[in-house]
């Protein structure tokens, strides 16, 4: 396995270079702006390429070291893509709504996850003895909890890295990550504040094709990390295993 490859052409075809209208910009993004066309800022892809490569390396390294990556993207055009990418790479996701305290109040979130698991058990049991109305209420509760927490139910604790689409919309998630010292990889559009992001990726965060490209690359970087981790585990096992020594032949038995 190796880090996923991508080209400038792919970025252009996905519309990664298109920012927002010039009047909507965040002046802190000036270093990443190439210019403007028809009152729309054009993001400097010559900077996006190395910064995206660095982000992919961080994701791979985190997973290779046994870390967990949380994908966050709750807006309509990112929601399904985020979930698919996280599932494909055996990572975790929040794609419906970020609940305040999702990271900083993990104990409460854990209790809700336990409740979700309990509901799964109850509803899976044929001999539960509930009325139709009671069962319907339990199913609604489970659906609500699963929509909010289904992507992190098996995470087992706070993540080691977060990947975020739309830093303006996910500002609470970023604040919580900062408070806990969790590094953040995020796409920063021309209307974003790059200061809060540890590993920024300058680019369009609205176009579905662009979002799909980022998520695919991040997922593949995580898969590369898994392969590296398994490879290292295999080497460790190989190094620790004793090489069997064949017994020396008895000269008398050769005769």
Curated annotation (Swiss-Prot):
Belongs to the universal ribosomal protein uS2 family. It comes from the Bacteria. SUPFAM superfamilies: Ribosomal protein S2. It comes from Sinorhizobium fredii (strain NBRC 101917 / NGR234). GO terms for biological process: translation. NCBIfam families: rpsB_bact (TIGR01011). GO terms for cellular component: cytosolic small ribosomal subunit. It holds the Pfam family Ribosomal_S2. GO terms for molecular function: structural constituent of ribosome. Residues 235-255 are annotated as: Disordered. CDD domains: RPS2 (cd01425). This is Small ribosomal subunit protein uS2. Keywords: Ribonucleoprotein, Ribosomal protein. PANTHER family: 30S RIBOSOMAL PROTEIN S2 PROKARYOTIC AND ORGANELLAR, SMALL RIBOSOMAL SUBUNIT PROTEIN US2M.
């Amino acid at each position: 396995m190796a880090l996923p490859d991508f080209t400038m052409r792919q970025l252009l075809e996905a519309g990664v270079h298109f920012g927002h209208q010039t009047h909507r910009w965040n002046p802190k993004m000036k270093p990443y702006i190439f210019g403007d066309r028809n009152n729309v800022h054009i993001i400097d892809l010559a900077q996006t390429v190395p910064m995206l490569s660095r982000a992919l390396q961080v994701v791979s390294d985190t997973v290779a070291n046994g870390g967990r990556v949380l994908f966050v993207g709750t807006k309509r055009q990112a929601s399904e893509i985020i979930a698919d990418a996280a599932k494909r790479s055996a990572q975790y996701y929040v794609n419906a709504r970020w609940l305040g305290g999702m990271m900083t109040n993990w104990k409460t979130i854990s209790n809700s996850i336990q409740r979700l698991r309990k509901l799964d058990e109850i509803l899976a049991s044929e001999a539960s003895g509930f009325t139709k109305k009671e069962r319907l209420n339990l199913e609604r509760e489970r659906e609500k909890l699963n929509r909010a927490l289904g992507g992190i139910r098996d995470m087992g604790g706070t993540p080691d890295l977060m990947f975020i689409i739309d830093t303006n919309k996910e500002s609470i998630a970023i604040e919580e990550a900062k408070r806990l010292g969790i590094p953040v990889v995020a796409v920063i559009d021309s209307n974003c504040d790059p200061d809060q992001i540890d590993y920024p990726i300058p680019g369009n965060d609205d176009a579905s094709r662009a979002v799909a490209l980022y998520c695919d690359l991040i997922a593949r970087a995580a898969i590369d990390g898994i392969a590296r981790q398994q490879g290292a585990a295999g080497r460790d096992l190989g190094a620790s295993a004793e090489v069997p020594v064949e017994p020396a032949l008895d000269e008398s038995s050769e005769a």
